Amino acid sequence: MTTVVILAGGKSERMGQDKALILGGVERIQKLVNQIGEYRIITLCGDKEREPLFSGEVWPDPIHCDCLARVIDWVIEKIDDDILFVPCDMYNLGIDGLTQLMVQPNCVAVDENEVRQPLLCHISDKSLLRNSKTLSEKFANFPSIECLDFVNQYSNFNYQEDLIDHLLQ
């Protein structure tokens, strides 16, 4: 079984608004996952005050975790299943791109700019993870999933300009 963990705890300072709520955000990803099949879905919400923003199973970040890499470690320790991490700002992600990640064990997605997206990954073998505070190093042992049909779905959005470009397409 695979547990899908939606990452929705960021401050979205560069975007200027809460990325978890833009264009359906977390709710849209939950719907995509449910269209594919029956999966446990957990939304990591960041601060406890953000819990009411989301439906379903919602976990606040533990206080003892000082960075996202440590939050990822904490989640991995708590979940025995395979884990598919999905950032809430994957606004192009569709069913076919998500399905491709579900069926590919131990992979990190690569976006249309050929950049690895370590937070969009499928973990089946936890022994491949490295102990590191940097995400790129933590997932360095995971092969890239370079599926040309879906690279445009594997891009995240960090700036308002990214979102404007997306909306104008």
Language model: regions and residue ranges:
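Nucleotide and nucleotide-moiety/phosphate-recognizing core
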Residues: 1-115, 130-135, 141-153, 161-163
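Short amphipathic alpha-helical segments
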Residues: 158-169
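Aromatic-glycine-rich donor-binding/catalytic loop that engages nucleotide-sugar donors
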Residues: 123-135, 167-169
